[in-house]
Amino acid sequence: LFDDRYEESLPLLEAMVYRFPEKKSYHRQLAALYAELKREDDSFYIQQIMYSKDMLEKHAELLRLAQLYLYYEVPYKAALILEKELEAERIKDEEKNWEQLANAWLSAREWKKAIPPLTKAAEMSEDGGLFLRLGQTYMQEEDWKNAEKNIRYAIKKGDLDNPGRAWLLLGITRNKKGIKFENSALFAFKRSTGYDDMEADARRWVKVIEAKQARREADRLAAEAAEAELADDTIYFN
């Protein structure tokens, strides 16, 4: 019964929107009516028009539109809206909203753009989870210094879902920073072996680093022996 009434009122409401294109209330009613009739694509389209005409002003409306862009797999557009409206303070300055902006940029594979909102969300968070994600984002950018710093802080802040993985990632970032960080990387990998779900991966890393260190030590000893042999004149004059 209600669906029939909605169907009957639809042509009139569509005509009103066409005749009064600046009337916000008609657009809002039409978007809601399309949603009631399970015409989600049409409802989304009307909300896009409303945003382009600055008819969406409330936090919930703006957030809903951004979430619809994410649902329709247009994360870049969602990120643009979230970024603009967070800066304008029409979307609330809250951890979950900054995290959603970061998620939108990450979904769009815009790692660098995800870093500022993810940093804000992490600073608002009570645990280390978002700092760990921030470290992983820096890893995507191959910024090993900042990756290591944020992962280390995530471990320090604690309450992580998977601390063993955090130690593993810390080891990887330290290893990427070069030979002089190898021992600290080895320490992190050994810490990671203490967690059942990470033990196998961490032990592989431990073996790789210890094998590299053993080869370098063998090369060093061989070089020292060669130098000693060259310096020993008695080899050649006896």
Named regions from a protein language model:
Residues 1-179, 186-238:
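Alpha-solenoid helical repeat scaffolds
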